[in-house]
Amino acid sequence: MLKERTHHANDPEESGSIRISRVKTYKTVAGPLFLRSGCSPSFVEGLKADEGLRTFARLPEREHQLLLSIAQQPENKVTLAYDASGNIVGQVSLAPLDHWWQDIGNAYEIAVVVSSSWRKLGIAHHLLSFALEFESVEESLIVGLGFSWHWDYEELGMSRFRYREMIARLFAAHGFAEYLTSEPNIRMDPANILVARLGSHIDGESMNCFFQRLLQSETLPGL
């Protein structure tokens, strides 16, 4: 069950500017959670990472510092799920695409993480849905890059390919499709995956650039 309230929050990190945050309460069998979009660095700093949140940095404390560094960049968007004690149990981050994709306009990389202690409660779906409710989403290209070395599939008792299927289903439910690509990091493991959501009003130049980058190498895996 979700209940929503919307408010404006003053963000001291942005020299007097106002950052808009939305908050929803989410009731689970493990207890109530809060979903908050537009999280400021000061808000992130006031929380702590749940013990099961260790996907990218392997330790909750480092995961929290990584999340804080993402929130400190004004062009990034951070959406959190946290409990009444201030423990972060899930997060979605949106950051401008770089490196291989850096010349594509209005393009973001999305990352989704849920604590291993809070799985199978629908949190990832609710976080994704909430994070994608921003004004320019239909003018945006959003790409998810899934790398098997970040996944905790062994702890879940599954193969990395089954974990890959789980990721594909999660994103497909929110308008993403899987694309073959020659991007070097994706090609390092056949279990790796690239998904993308092309907004309904994305400009033609950005779309053409995206497909050109997918095919940038002469060798495209799977063909």
Where do the model's predicted regions map?
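Short, high-confidence coil segments that cap the C-terminus of an alpha-helix
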Residues: 76, 137-140
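Conserved acetyl-CoA-binding loop-helix of GNAT-fold acetyltransferases
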Residues: 114, 120-136
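A conserved beta-strand-loop-helix scaffold within acyl/acetyltransferase catalytic domains
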Residues: 57-108, 112
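Surface-exposed cleft-lining segments at the edges of enzyme active sites
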Residues: 52-53, 108, 113-118, 154
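Terminal substrate-recognition subdomain of acyl/acetyltransferases
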Residues: 1-46, 140-223
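Well-ordered, non-membrane alpha-helical segments in soluble/globular domains
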Residues: 60-63, 126-130, 160-169
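Conserved GNAT-fold acetyl-CoA-binding loop/helix
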Residues: 42-66
